[in-house]
């Protein structure tokens, strides 16, 4: 699925319970399809198809990964409560209880004292096995699978912390197994890494997702993947911060592989001067995606600009400034309009149509093959019987349309003639025809033409011959593929 960068990304993150060794749609009950507490941070509870596959096909959550055994893991920040006296991270922590000399009973440090390097030395001299500290959230993350996670008490990502990463409150909202509860800070083992850890990429792109009904959020996250790339992408005015990551991870934007300076920028390539020499990045121009949408990369840098490794140097369809830009920022009014917006209908301004705000480019491919038939070989040619000069004005000498030609319904893209006749040719007749090239033979026009109602501009022509492509299907001598780009304005329906 390549409708837009998000569709491509979520296609690659799909999980299915169907197929060999899996379930059958008809046999899968409600229990299998329902959301389970082990999905938390692993499988998105929102992104799933509506229909017979609901709950059987899912998407990976934002931070989930698959481990070496095939189990899905999710990251958590470790909460540290006990430390070894020789731990370098002990400096800056606060004591959970008084420290006394085990031999004399002398008070070394009071409870809640902030540990410094001097106190660490004293503690190490006491030869204590461990030091109890006020729990703090460390920077180390650990990936846990569902069965391991069930053993721990986990705090929410938005739990307030002080400047020392310690819990501000004594009672904290936590999760243990499938129960949500309030726990003391001493019993917490881990903390979520981010609030959107629970949802997938598409759902994480919806602002204020927590205020939406789950059913409508499901529709919204699925419909984002159906958005066709527009002529002028527009970054959302209200974003969630996931737009950059979604665009980068989709693989459609061009990223600088090294630090360097831009020495040349043209429509179809960018040259970067780096410490290891000049690096040329070729851009994809007007390429057809699997869904017939247009993949067109545009430079996002200017000549002389310094770029760093990992910077976006070229945008693709539905991205702007290296961020995902699926739609347009428009003013929406919530009111009745003489019944024209009854139920799920909407009224849009004519200005949006005139300004091409919602205009998209679609590229269709048309193919024709010349075969060796029983009556003789078909031929791709400009010499087509009973066709006026006007119909073949854009064809080259070989009978193939030129790039840049405007075509409409029933226009010839590739001229082709096929032999017609009731009888099969004998080998002798074939030989004579090959030698003398009998022009007056009986042929019919089997040219490739534009379908009814279709029009556009030819953006690419590819010719495949038997000599260059041995994998052409049997009996095919030559194949021509013509790509036609079409601008489509937003229309009713």
Where are these regions (language model features)?
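Intrinsically disordered, low-complexity regulatory segments
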Residues: 1-493
